[in-house]
């Protein structure tokens, strides 16, 4: 039935994005009865999609962890956020980084050659899909491209050459999915990602929100009203310029201005969608923790105390986007 398919999909999504769990934990996460969870689990065990792992106890009767089968294979992630380099990784079904490499590649053909050569050096028979991790808008797994890279031609060329599924995902959204493993169960989370630009992704009630004509978290050029450098692109002292300045000038005044700007942009979003957590990813290690604390304090001056979300630094490191991208691809293949 549709309900059973939906519950199966939700259960797989939970294991893929939030990590291994016992039957009891899955019942709590999904709000499903124990018998319903057991029926779905037995079906997935029977077809080899999931396997039973270690027995764990959280104070009650021990339970057995359920995880995605290691026999599922690996996913190749091509990080295309740099205009002239492609960073490549293989990620296991359990979300572990297996191998990494990078190659100079600016145009479509160069990227395709780099990806196919990387797969040839790995174990090609173990690869179950390729995901393109990009900074731009992704619509139903397709990316138009940017600069010298034609996203649709690249995906089509890789599908033909490799005979594998190839999809694109937005890097901020992928990072948010990776960060979800470290968040509480009932979470409304915003991940703010700083790399070549500023982007945000939203996860509400376990669901990733995606934009229609632009990225959901397109907050880069919002003007917060705090002093900062003028942006060449929009001509204003926008949030993106204030946060990018932290990479070259981590002075206290710059950090405080950045925190106030970030809080000014996040406060109405937090109030509007009941955010419980903000995660900062990609910020310089030297300032990330202090920025999180200052942003939280600034939010408290703009909102009711009971509405202020927690602000923390991502624990996933520079590989977060790749790990999250692989999780999104795996869910697309199995869910």
Indicate where each model-derived feature is located.
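Short, acidic Gly/Pro/Ser/Thr-rich loop/turn segments
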Residues: 83-85, 137-139, 198-199
């Amino acid at each position: 039935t549709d309900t059973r398919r939906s519950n199966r999909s939700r259960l797989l999504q939970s294991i893929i994005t939030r990590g291994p769990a016992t039957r009891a934990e899955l019942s709590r996460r999904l709000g499903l009865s124990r018998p319903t969870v057991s029926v779905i689990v037995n079906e997935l065990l029977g077809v080899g999609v999931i396997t039973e792992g270690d027995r764990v106890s959280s104070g009650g009767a021990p339970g057995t962890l359920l995880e995605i089968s290691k026999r599922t294979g690996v996913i190749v992630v091509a990080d295309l956020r740099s205009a002239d380099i492609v960073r490549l990784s293989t990620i296991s079904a359990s979300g572990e980084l297996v191998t990494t490499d990078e190659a100079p590649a600016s145009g479509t053909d160069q990227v395709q050659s780099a990806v196919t050569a990387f797969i040839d050096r790995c174990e090609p028979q173990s690869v179950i899909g390729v995901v393109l991790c990009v900074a731009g808008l992704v619509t139903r797994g397709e990316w138009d491209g940017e600069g010298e890279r034609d996203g649709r031609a690249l995906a089509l060329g890789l599908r033909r050459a490799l005979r594998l599924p190839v999809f694109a995902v937005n890097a901020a959204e992928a990072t948010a999915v990776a960060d979800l493993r470290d968040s509480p169960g009932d979470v409304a989370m915003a991940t703010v990602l700083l790399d070549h630009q500023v982007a945000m992704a939203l996860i509400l009630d376990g669901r990733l929100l995606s934009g229609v004509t632009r990225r959901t978290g397109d907050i880069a050029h919002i003007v917060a009203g705090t002093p900062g450098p003028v942006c060449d692109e929009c001509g204003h002292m926008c949030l993106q310029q204030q946060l990018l300045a932290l990479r070259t000038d981590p002075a206290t005044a710059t950090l405080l201005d950045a925190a106030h700007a970030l809080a000014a942009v996040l406060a109405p979003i937090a109030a509007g969608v009941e955010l419980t957590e903000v995660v900062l990813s990609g910020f310089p290690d030297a300032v990330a923790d202090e920025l999180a604390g200052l942003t939280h304090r600034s939010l408290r001056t703009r909102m009711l105390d009971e509405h202020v979300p927690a602000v923390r630094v991502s624990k996933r490191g520079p590989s977060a986007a790749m790990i999250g991208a692989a999780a999104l691809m795996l869910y697309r293949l199995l869910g």
